[in-house]
A protein has these predicted regions:
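Short, glycine-/Ser/Thr-/acidic-enriched flexible segments
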Residues: 10-14, 35, 97-99, 129-133, ...
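Helical lid/core segments from catalytic subdomains that handle acyl or acyl-like groups
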Residues: 17-98
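A short, small/polar-residue-rich loop/turn motif at beta-strand boundaries
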Residues: 88-121
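Generic recognition of flexible, low-complexity loop/linker segments
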Residues: 77-80, 113-114, 124-127
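A structural signal for short secondary-structure junctions
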Residues: 1, 22, 83-86, 118-122, ...
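Short beta-strand/turn micro-motifs at beta-sheet edges
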Residues: 15-19, 124-127
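Extended, hydrophobic beta-loop-alpha segments that form or line the acyl/peptidyl-thioester binding
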Residues: 120-166
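Hydrophobic "lid/gating" helix adjacent to the active-site nucleophile
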Residues: 1-16
Length: 166
């Protein structure tokens, strides 16, 4: 049993700083293995599937399609975006933040969180961000799809508790 999540895949070289500001990512559908009960097996299966996605053409192709969509009039944009949305249950994104705490105007920044953007009929967004040795999760839901988002959040906690027992 799987659900399809659209995940952004970084297209910039990791060993080189970006020459200009802005996003450079492609989107790829990741089948999330929700039917695997063992949390360790599930993590490794997600990692394996992500590795396959990063090693194929799909994220680069999606980047090109999104760039093309930006040049089209609204009906054309809607049609292209519909291709992505029709096969997607969720958007899941992971951002690696700094390993050490930042300072802003002399004050320490204790927590950082962001919210993934969802579009159209995609009713679930999960954002994951590491910062200074901690991980923050954000959950965004469409009430028609998930009227009780706290129940999903509680499951995050339960799954992490399972991992810490191993």
């Amino acid at each position: 049993q799987d659900i399809r999540a659209m995940v952004p895949v970084n297209l910039r070289p990791l060993d080189q700083p970006p020459w200009e500001l802005g996003n450079r990512f492609g989107l790829a559908p990741l089948l999330m293995p929700i039917g695997i009960d063992n949390p360790v097996e599930r993590v490794y299966e997600v990692r394996r599937r992500m590795g396959e996605l990063k090693d194929n053409y799909q994220p680069l192709l999606a980047y090109g399609v999104l760039a093309l969509a930006g040049l089209l009039i609204k009906p054309g944009q809607d049609a292209l975006m519909g291709l992505f949305q029709a096969k997607t249950t969720a958007i899941v994104t992971n951002v690696r933040g700094p390993d050490t705490p930042l300072r802003l105007c002399g004050a320490g920044v204790s927590d950082v969180v962001f919210w993934v953007t969802t579009a159209g009929d995609i009713g679930l967004g999960v954002s994951i961000m590491s910062y200074a040795g901690a991980v923050q999760f954000g959950l965004r839901t469409d009430e028609a799809l998930c009227a009780e988002p706290q129940a999903v959040i509680d499951q995050f906690v339960a799954e992490f508790d399972k991992l810490t027992l191993l």
